[in-house]
């Protein structure tokens, strides 16, 4: 009976993480209190992050075993919610066996940093005036963003699958990373790609492009090309 009651309380608490009234089905989820407000999030250590925008800020974490939770850190530092695994003094591999997950509901988000093999998945959309997205080191981002100005950095084998709208997009992709953004429609785009990386995007009005060292930029839409610079096997193509 106690176990059933605990599960019910957890389910009710986790409804705050959905944009509508969807329930997150995770029997291992534990709600954590927040020490303050935040407008940025940083996640690392191979943690899977599930994000939703709503009227409240809320946080829950989950792991395959209770032993991982003590080192599963969540803290707010200078307006940034940092989510990571403290591996000091222990042998740790972010190979997925611990099944570390974080569920975050936010009111306003201006910056998201995803690194060290973590995944970030958006439930619904992120809506912001200016938004910065940084994904690196084999990490993955998947979601919808609507922003007036969107700045994206992708590097070191990371991958972004993004949809939404923006007035201005600045994207820098390097070191084998991939920006899959045909479903992201922007008016103006400044794109820089290098070292075997790729950019795919839809542009309505104007493109500035720089491709080098085997990097490729592929774009759809009606954009006029304002400036193109290619070198060392880089390419810019309309599809």
Where in this protein do the model-derived segments appear?
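Intrinsically disordered, low-complexity terminal regions
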Residues: 1-239
């Amino acid at each position: 009976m106690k176990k059933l009651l605990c599960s019910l309380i957890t389910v009710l608490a986790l409804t705050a993480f959905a944009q509508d009234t969807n329930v997150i089905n995770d029997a291992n989820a534990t709600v954590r209190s927040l020490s303050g407000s935040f407008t940025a999030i940083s996640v690392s250590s191979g943690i899977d992050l599930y994000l939703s925008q709503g009227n409240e800020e809320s946080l829950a974490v989950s792991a395959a075993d209770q032993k991982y939770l003590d080192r599963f850190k969540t803290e707010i530092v200078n307006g940034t919610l940092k989510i990571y695994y403290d591996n000091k003094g222990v042998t740790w591999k972010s190979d997925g066996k611990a099944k570390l997950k974080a569920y975050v509901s936010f009111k306003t988000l201006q910056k998201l940093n995803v690194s060290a093999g973590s995944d970030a998945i958006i439930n619904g959309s992120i809506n912001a005036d200016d938004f910065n997205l940084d994904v690196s080191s084999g990490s993955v981002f998947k979601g919808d963003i609507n922003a007036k100005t969107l700045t994206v950095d992708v590097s070191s084998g990371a991958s972004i699958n993004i949809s939404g709208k923006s007035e201005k997009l600045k994207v820098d992709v390097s070191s084998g990373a991939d920006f899959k953004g045909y479903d992201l429609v922007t008016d103006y785009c400044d794109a820089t790609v290098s070292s075997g990386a790729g950019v795919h995007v839809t542009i309505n009005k104007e493109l500035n492009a720089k491709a080098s060292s085997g990097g490729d930029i592929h774009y759809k839409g009606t954009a006029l090309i304002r400036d193109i610079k290619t070198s060392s096997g880089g390419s810019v193509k309309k599809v």
